[in-house]
Amino acid sequence: MKTRRQMKIQEIINNQVIHTQEELAELLRKAGFDVTQATVSRDIKEMGLIKVPTSEDDYRYAVPGTAQPLSTPDRLKRRLRETVVTVNDSENLVVLRTIPGNAQALASLIDHSNWEEVIGTVAGDDTILLVVKPAGAVPSVRERIAKLMQ
């Protein structure tokens, strides 16, 4: 019974967007399985299912390795919104302060975004230094960051 139920869970996860354990439990009940949320929770853990982002504020269950990751622009937008505390500049530099532990991942996303004016980033634990060339492009870089954070 457990094996059949877990096969059905995998089938459901692969064919539908499931946001919560309760949604999954309801679909299993409709398919003839007598389950509780606790049973579904144990199955999810045993199967190693993960929650992956589907949009800015939404997640769904997925089998590891099958979910399409967010594109770099979407990931950058999300990271900027969720982790940036302040944005400052001086001369040809833009300095982003982040929640501790987030600077390196955000800097990598900025690097992979290939912003023409940003010739490099340096990141610590909670600070990112963006080197901008020419210096006159600093306002446009700040504006781009502000738009992405909206």
From Swiss-Prot:
GO cellular component, one term: cytoplasm
GO process annotations (BP): L-arginine biosynthetic process; protein complex oligomerization; regulation of arginine biosynthetic process
InterPro entries the UniProt entry points to: Arg_repress (IPR001669), Arg_repress_C (IPR020899), Arg_repress_C_sf (IPR036251), Arg_repress_DNA-bd (IPR020900), WH-like_DNA-bd_sf (IPR036388), WH_DNA-bd_sf (IPR036390)
Disulfide-bonded cysteines: none
Primary location recorded for the protein, binned into one broad class: cytoplasm
Domain of life: Bacteria
Pathway entry: Amino-acid biosynthesis; L-arginine biosynthesis [regulation]
UniProt keyword list: Amino-acid biosynthesis, Arginine biosynthesis, Cytoplasm, DNA-binding, Repressor, Transcription, Transcription regulation
Stretches that traverse the bilayer: none
GO molecular function terms listed in the Swiss-Prot or TrEMBL record: arginine binding; DNA binding; DNA-binding transcription factor activity
Annotated compartments: Cytoplasm
SUPFAM superfamilies to which the protein is assigned, alphabetical: C-terminal domain of arginine repressor, Winged helix' DNA-binding domain
PANTHER family: ARGININE REPRESSOR (PTHR34471:SF1)
Function statement: Regulates arginine biosynthesis genes.
Entry similarity comment: Belongs to the ArgR family.
Protein name in the entry: Arginine repressor
Species in which this protein is naturally found: Desulfitobacterium hafniense (strain Y51)
Lineage per the UniProt record: Bacteria, Bacillati, Bacillota, Clostridia, Eubacteriales
Annotated gene: argR
